[in-house]
Curated annotation (Swiss-Prot):
Topology of this chain in the membrane: Multi-pass membrane protein
Residue ranges that the UniProt entry lists as topological domain Cytoplasmic: 1-65, 119-247, 296-646, 698-713, 781-792, 843-956
Any one annotated GO CC term: plasma membrane
UniProt topological domain (Extracellular) ranges: 86-97, 269-277, 667-674, 735-759, 814-821
More about this protein: As many as 6 to 8 closely related genes may encode other isoforms of plasma membrane ATPase in tomato, like the LHA2 gene product which is 96% identical to the LHA1 gene product.
Record PANTHER family: CALCIUM-TRANSPORTING ATPASE
Lineage per the UniProt record: Eukaryota, Viridiplantae, Streptophyta, Embryophyta, Tracheophyta
The name this protein goes by in its record: Plasma membrane ATPase 1
Native organism: Solanum lycopersicum (Tomato)
Highest rank taxon of the organism: Eukaryota
């Protein structure tokens, strides 16, 4: 051990070319053997070479904190702070220090909350991503074990197999050549072949084969590590960030317009004094900007991401949450996702093709062509049929094992029997095994008949073949292959798959089965799961189908209507995703293998299922840690709840901006009312503190896929904000210009006086604006009536605490610096009552906006035909014709005729009409059977009588 540091020092300084010297010299220089390192030696080398990972630059905590004050919304607040001490310094008054301090305090509070929450979210995300850290099979102390790739050191012996991402730079040892995808490193588009002695780079992907290798470089010393130092990381602006920017810009522009109008009217027209004008501008700046928006939305997303992880879905990309919320098509693997991937073989159904061989011998041959360790589901099922798994290698000596790969779709074992004769046995996809057989033409028809018979019962087929190798060399082709038998494999559906698919459809997510199995198996599984049997072979994707009923349909439409596809290869998955995206669908795709990576990357939401390969996980947006489809649907619901919280807040933020800008601008310009800027700061601080709790609010997920609709957000915000602004103007008019409130409620008057002391009026306006503005969140957070959908207790508690503080300030505060005076409990009660009355129509306004934006209201206004026709059921014939046409087209009986549909009608609406018609018919039938009134009406209709002339009473 004494000489090791010097030798390893040479390796550390890269003075030895380990990539090109002979493999034996590699072992000599690394002071290791083919039996691997000991755990002690590995630990010593870890202290020399460091962990096998790229160290990220540590960001300064202080600079990160300041970064939260560096965005367009914060810039506006910072401009307001400068205005408070620089511009608001005239008219015989000192600078507005209280507003300056208040603004800075508000900025610090928001930045602190953002910093703490993002730091917590970052720590949680790091812990979650640690669960996804790549693993490596490494030989230590003479035993193979799975370790984190980060603890690999030069000299370790590792195992590389299909789907693995190479964990470190290494030299290959004896074994079959690998197909390595180095496109991420070298730009080579095609996989390259690497044999024994060749070097492989960290970060490349194994596309085919299995082999052992010796690690020669780790961490920053790898080819990938050196390249990473030369490249700066790039931050891609996501859709979420664009939406955030758009909403922020809308609010800033609204404030700018209000300020420009105020400047034009106050100074050139009204000839107002300088200082009051600046104060009014500060009110719009401070009150209108949604300074908490980045914090609220980021915190909501981070908390939601953590909740998803608890449900078994780890989000690698935060913005995948909003895409998951909008997903309307999910292309799901069958095996392992819709089914258990726990295969069973019915020995009684085994179909033997070779003479003199029984079912037990077939099982033994299939077991020999299986792995004893590190098994897949098929290996487990086959070897599990033996009385003792050791029987699979009993009496033979293994020479060479060919692992499964997507190209050959089979495994094979070359072995020596007790007499020293060499044999080879193979199992795999029936077509591949059949192609090996020397008598393929004689048995092909029978093989396909058996396969179809199995498939009709939902059983997969596994072929087994055997050959002798008289040459006695593992490289030799051997004698003729003999097709031995077909084994039936049954993969039972998950107990919750059918219910989950039904839930998905109710949520507007269409689940399509994507399977590599036969069409008949796909249809049988679809039938059992209740997802439909409208499935097609993969040849239909290429327009090569011979089925005349679907040959006339465009491929895009075929994919959109299909319940699934069978016989699918990874390249077909990519095509399916591309076509669905072209039809404006938000598409999710599940995958587990290395060849699924392109489709997972192409999909809007790539989902790596439980036990997926490193390559699939790397390409995905979401990694599942639990098996089954139910995890995905639960993640969809959670994502929609997260999205709903963000959407609720953005509508609220826009509403408050419009409400503050329009309301205070009108008060300033009509009655020359100067509201104290400091009180707007108090409103902002209390509002922001309360609104932070919306990230944990109880919400109802949307029943349909969600997406950012900026027109809806802006329209709803402008209308609700405009309504609240007008109610404040009306309240001001009633309190200032009339004696309505004193006459009705017996409170002191706030009417206009000779001195026009606005102090009490300012307190009244403060309380009116504060309470109704914050109460608006209960309207924007609910889809139906706000008093029906129960909010989270934290939000309710925060609201009442904030408004209790606001009420106490309005009742008791006599702050000369803020120009307010207490109004007493009488006025406080009047204002709360006024705001309750103001609150009631908000839900109705929300419903009207939603109805108007849906387009249906405009159809009625523009067409005007329904209102003026004498027909009782206008357009009934056209609707019936459209529905019948849609049904015939959906079942492939008729080519779609675009002329028959109006611009506002589509297949989905017609299908919905059809479903509603079915439900109405069923309700009518049950009503006729089970109610006396229904029975009487049925008889009257059947006899052709007029019910008005029948003088008898009946009971409902």
């Amino acid at each position: 051990m004494a000489e090791k540091p010097e030798v390893l020092d040479a390796v550390l300084k890269e003075t030895v070319d380990l990539e090109n010297i002979p493999i034996e010299e590699v072992f000599e220089n690394l002071r290791c053997t083919r039996e691997g390192l000991t755990a002690t030696a590995a630990q010593e080398r870890l202290s020399i070479f460091g962990y096998n990972k790229l160290e990220e630059k540590k960001e300064s905590k202080f600079l990160k904190f300041l970064g939260f004050m560096w965005n367009p919304l914060s810039w506006v607040m910072e401009a307001a702070a400068i205005m408070a001490i620089a511009l608001a310094n005239g008219g015989g008054k000192p600078p507005d220090w209280q507003d300056f301090v208040g603004i800075i305090t508000l900025l610090i509070i928001n930045s602190t909350i953002s910093f703490i929450e993002e730091n917590n979210a970052g720590n949680a995300a790091a812990a979650l991503m640690a669960r996804l850290a790549p693993k490596a099979k490494v030989l230590r102390d003479g035993k193979w074990d799975e370790e984190d790739a980060s603890v690999l050191v030069p000299g370790d012996i590792i195992s590389i197999k299909l789907g693995d991402i190479i964990p470190a730079d290494a030299r290959l040892l004896e074994g079959d050549p690998l197909k390595i995808d180095q496109s991420a490193l070298t730009g080579e588009s095609l996989p390259v072949t690497k044999g024994p002695g060749d070097g492989v780079y960290s970060g490349s992907t194994c596309k085919q084969g299995e082999i052992e290798a010796v690690v020669i470089a780790t961490g920053v010393h790898t080819f990938f590590g050196k390249a990473a130092h030369l490249v700066d990381s790039t931050n891609q602006v996501g859709h979420f960030q664009k939406v955030l920017t758009a909403i922020g810009n809308f609010c800033i522009c609204s404030i700018a317009v209000g300020m420009i109008i105020e400047i034009i009217v106050m100074y050139p027209i009204q000839h107002r004094k300088y200082r009051p004008g600046i104060d009014n501008l500060l009110v719009l700046l401070i009150g209108g900007i949604p300074i908490a928006m980045p914090t609220v939305l980021s915190v909501t997303m981070a908390i939601g991401s953590h909740r998803l992880a608890q449900q078994g879905a780890i989000t690698k990309r935060m913005t995948a949450i909003e895409e998951m919320a909008g997903m309307d098509v999910l292309c799901s693997d069958k095996t392992g996702t819709l089914t258990l991937n726990k295969l069973t073989v019915d020995k009684a159904l085994i179909e033997v093709f070779a003479k003199g061989i029984d079912a037990d011998t077939v099982v033994l041959m299939a077991a020999r062509a299986s792995r004893i360790e590190n098994q897949d589901a098929i290996d487990t099922a086959i070897v599990g049929m033996l009385a003792d798994p050791k029987e699979a290698r009993a009496g033979i000596r293994e020479i060479h094992f060919l692992p499964f790969n997507p190209t050959d779709k089979r495994t094979a074992l070359t072995y020596l029997d007790g007499e020293g004769k060499m044999h080879r046995v193979s199992k795999g996809a029936p077509e591949q095994i059949l192609n090996l057989a020397h008598n393929k033409s004689d048995i092909e028809r029978r093989v396909h008949t058996v396969i179809d018979k199995f498939a009709e019962r939902g059983l997969r087929s596994l072929g087994v073949a055997y050959q002798e190798v008289p040459e006695g060399r593992k490289e030799s082709a051997g004698g003729p292959w003999q097709f031995i038998a077909l084994l039936p494999l049954f993969d039972p559906p998950r107990h919750d798959s059918a219910e989950t698919i039904r839930r998905a459809l109710n949520l507007g997510v269409n689940v399509k089965m994507i399977t590599g199995d036969q069409l008949a198996i796909g249809k049988e599984t679809g039938r059992r799961l209740g997802m439909g049997t409208n499935m097609y072979p993969s040849s239909a994707l290429l327009g090569q189908t011979k089925d005349e009923s679907i040959a006339a349909l465009p491929i895009d439409e075929l994919i959109e209507k299909a319940d699934g596809f069978a016989g699918v290869f990874p390249e077909h998955k990519y095509e399916i995703v591309k076509r669905l995206q072209a039809r404006k669908h938000i598409c999710g795709m599940t995958g587990d293998g290395v060849n699924d990576a392109p489709a997972l990357k192409k999909a809007d939401i790539g989902i790596a299922v439980d036990d997926a390969t490193d390559a699939a996980r790397s390409a995905s947006d979401i990694v599942l840690t639990e098996p089954g489809l139910s995890v995905i649907i639960s993640a969809v619901l959670t994502s929609r709840a997260i999205f709903q919280r963000m959407k609720n807040y953005t509508i609220y933020a826009v509403s408050i901006t419009i409400r503050i800008v329009l309301g205070f601008m009108l008060l300033a310009l009509i009655w020359k009312f100067d509201f104290p800027p400091f009180m707007v700061l108090i409103i902002a601080i209390l509002n922001d503190g309360t609104i932070m709790t919306i990230s944990k609010d109880r919400v109802k997920p949307s029943p349909l896929p969600d997406s950012w609709k900026l027109a809806e957000i802006f329209t709803t915000g402008v209308v609700l904000g405009g309504y609240l602004a007008m109610m404040t103007v009306i309240f001001f008019w009633a309190a200032y210009k009339t004696n309505f409130f004193p006459r009705i409620f017996g409170v002191s008057t706030l009417e206009k006086t000779a001195t026009d002391d606005f102090r009490k009026l300012a307190s009244a306006i403060y309380l009116q604006v504060s309470t109704i503005s914050q109460a608006l969140i209960f309207v924007t957070r609910s889809r139906s009536w706000s008093f029906v959908e129960r909010p989270g207790l934290l939000l309710v508690f925060a609201f009442f605490v904030a408004q209790l503080v606001a009420t106490l300030i309005a009742v008791y505060a006599n702050w000369s610096f803020a120009a307010i005076e207490g109004i007493g409990w009488g006025w406080a009660g009047v204002i709360w009552l006024y705001n309750i009355v103001t609150y009631i129509p908000l839900d109705l306004i929300k419903f009207l906006i939603r109805y108007a934006l849906s387009g249906k209201a405009w159809d009625l206004v523009l067409e005007q035909r329904i209102a003026f026709t004498r027909k009782k059921d206008f357009g009934k014939e056209l609707r019936e014709l459209q529905w019948a046409h849609a049904q015939r087209t959906l079942h492939g009986l008729q080519v779609p005729d675009p002329k028959i549909f109006s611009e506002t009608t589509n297949f989905n609406e017609l299908n919905q009409l059809a479903e509603e018609a079915k439900r109405r018919a069923e309700i009518a039938r049950l009503r006729e059977l089970h109610t006396l009134k229904g029975h009487v009406e049925s008889v009257v209709k059947l006899k052709g009588l007029d019910i008005e002339t029948i003088q008898q009473s009946y009971t409902v």
